[in-house]
Amino acid sequence: MQLHILNNPKDAALAADAEFLKQSLFNLLHEEASPLVVETVKLLSTSDDSAALIEKVLPQLDERQTYDLTLACGLFAQILNIAEDVHHERRRQIHEDAGHNAAEGSLTETVRRLKAGKADGKSVQRQLDNTSVTAVLTAHPTEVQRQTVLNFNRRIRALLPQRERCTNADALARLRREIDTVLLGLWQTSETRRHKLSVNDEINNGVSIFPMSFFEALPKLYRKMEHDFQTAYPDVRVPNILKIGGWIGGDRDGNPFVSGETLRFAFRRHADAVFRFYRSELDKLYRELPLSIRRVKVNDDVMALAALSPDEEIARTEEPYRRAIAYIMARAMGKARSLGLGMGCKFGFLEPYASAQKFLDDLKKLQRSLIDNGSRLLAEGRLADLIRSVSVFGFHMMPLDLRQHAGKHADVVAELFQHAGLEDYNSLNEEQKQAALLRELGHQRPLYSPFITYSDHTRRELAIFNEARKIKDEFGEDAVTQSIISNCEQPGDLLALALLLKESGLLAVENGKPHSRINIVPLFETIEALENACPVMETMFRLDWYDALLESRGNIQEIMLGYSDSNKDGGYVTSSWCLHQAELGLVELFKKYDVRMRLFHGRGGSVGRGGGPSYQAILAQPAGSVAGQIRITEQGEVITAKYADPGNAQRNLETLVAATLEASILPDKKDPDAKLMQALSDVSFKYYRELITHPDFIDYFLQTSPIQEIATLNLGSRPASRKTLARIQDLRAIPWVFSWMQNRLMLPAWYGFGSAVETLCEGSPETLAALRGHAQNNPFFQAMLSNMEQVMAKTDITLAENYAGLSESPEKAKVIFGMIKEEYRRSRKALLDLLQTEELLRDNRSLARSLALRIPYLNALNGLQVAMLKRLRKEPDNPHALLMVHLTINGVAQGLRNTG
């Protein structure tokens, strides 16, 4: 392990942690692996060309040794991740304890900037009242690690900070033994899934984050928000500006296994988790509030609750708060029982709360009484946190969005029209479709009849909307609030969804005006769709019917923007610019029609799917596009990295809120030169499309990446492609990006950029100067280049050439790889020119250090992957080769800390 990289005194503790874990892993290898494997791993730690070392050693290894070597390299990546996570937390705590200036991206710093920017309390309160930030957890299959493996990692992460606190050799030896024990369990556990995840598995995985993290992190973060704001603005109150949302169980786009049943299962699991949390917190409150009426006064409304209490122990006669809490718990658990949840209550069950608000009202009575009668500290502790939790989580824990492809909605509408004796919907042009849909939306009568036999597809689609209606009735109105139309291209796509909502009782016409219980959200995802977003929405805003519908939803229109497909469609530069342009256009359009806009950013974990640091990404949004309202998807390995630990979760959510407030209240940002950016986009698009439309490109991609093996990894419940793969557009964006990361090209995040810069700057020093100026001063361009720099630092063209050797047509591969290699050279040169530096990551020491530590094991895993792919292509039925490929895919993803 290249610990000489950690020569900065600030990294001394990281070096010690890494060495400590390394020694534990070597202890394990000496016991569990052959001497040849142990020696090879030791050589890798100091090798300058670990892929070449693997190529030399591999012929000497049998199947068991190959497995052990691959697993060992992957485990080194995992323990380095853990050591770095612990170190980040350590440095943050040291920074905070030393009283240094608040870090960028913290709420403390944001509030300081607001105060320095002369924002007064009224304007801050107004902004907070109009702020809504949601991190939306999705089931997109990008988490390669099993939950079992993640649990082992969490145990090591919890143990490692104890190393610094060990004061003698015996304590250190005990800690060593504990970590050795966890590592042995990890070593003897299968790293890969043997069976495909079901939708219910994904739901359970998503729910598990809440008791592990969110139930603790959100109340703490709200408490910090209140402290930070009230320190600067004493009269400001913090409403519920931050929530967690989800898609898991309601996202049907491309997933035939999502249904009304999975939606119901999801909310039962949500409710089970949140009611167990409430029961636990109420039980703790019961123990913390034995206040006696001999010692304190108690408000009448709390005495009234106590009088209804099922807790009739004689010792409780003088303890009204405990009696009131027993009453509240019995009613809350009564609600849990009415929802079919099998959990008990030591006080029995009383009439269920009709809503989370009623539950909240009773808790607030306790708080008010404590404050009124001199017990403010007790009121502002656990009770305040529980009140905040109930107001945020309700009975549903997190809302789920519904999502389906526009074409699937259209199929249902067409069948409803057919059986109702109406016109042939599919034969209508767009204008005729709009007219027909508006006509039907104006009628009270439904099109659906229970006496007609419909196709399975239509029955399933209507069933999930009907289930959503029932869930809203049972779990609360906030349980399901959005229905997203993926691949939205025309106004008729929005009206078609509206008709399905009407057929399901989620949209009604009252006194000639529509009223919807769910937001209709178009998702614009391809380059063409992004360019057409404004015309589509302007058509909708001109409709009196839709204007009335928006009025019923608070005059807010949510728009979802797709980063993944637009990138696959046009490359990173063009995708980034088209998204920016679409947002600028939408800002002006919404102002024109006096509609409030909320943007929902469909970002992935990788740069090729819109990933990158959230703080910079939000601040780089066009002026006026945030305005306090933002939703962002979080998925797969991102959920694990950001939110599996309460401390990490709190900091990452704090960053989202801080960036949203800064972008909304301090929107003084320079728009990039539109003419210059458009020219850069056009040339980049040209070169990118030349590559992916090359007649030999698809075969090259399939043969020189593990795309087909990724499809067999059992990462998620939905298929890897929408149909038989014959074109790039048939492939989902996740495996597309995932594959390019595995073969170390990261192509979707930079291809075309170098040629664009070279073309524009040739003979034009003014253009070069302008681009350099943007690189220094423009948030949009800075974020683009920063993300590209991080990706190019992980790119290894030499390793990628080894993958090119997997092609069945060496001459054709030589042409395609030659194009890629030359564009990489140009893009790297252009990036360094614009950043005016001689090396990548010069200003990102943390990432440079992280990559340097991982490189020996990461490159070894790539070398193993190439060898195993070569073997698998020759022997397609070789189970060992397939297992090894799967194991290397896991390991490379861990080494890069990214998948798709």
Swiss-Prot record:
Keywords per UniProt: Carbon dioxide fixation, Lyase, Magnesium
Membrane spanning stretches: none
E.C. number(s) listed in UniProt: 4.1.1.31
GO molecular function: magnesium ion binding; phosphoenolpyruvate carboxylase activity
Reaction(s) catalysed (UniProt annotation): oxaloacetate + phosphate = phosphoenolpyruvate + hydrogencarbonate
PANTHER family listed in its UniProt record: PHOSPHOENOLPYRUVATE CARBOXYLASE (PTHR30523:SF6)
HAMAP family attached to this UniProt entry: PEPcase_type1
Similarity field: Belongs to the PEPCase type 1 family.
Function of the molecule: Forms oxaloacetate, a four-carbon dicarboxylic acid source for the tricarboxylic acid cycle.
Protein name as it appears in the record: Phosphoenolpyruvate carboxylase
Lineage: Bacteria, Pseudomonadati, Pseudomonadota, Betaproteobacteria, Neisseriales
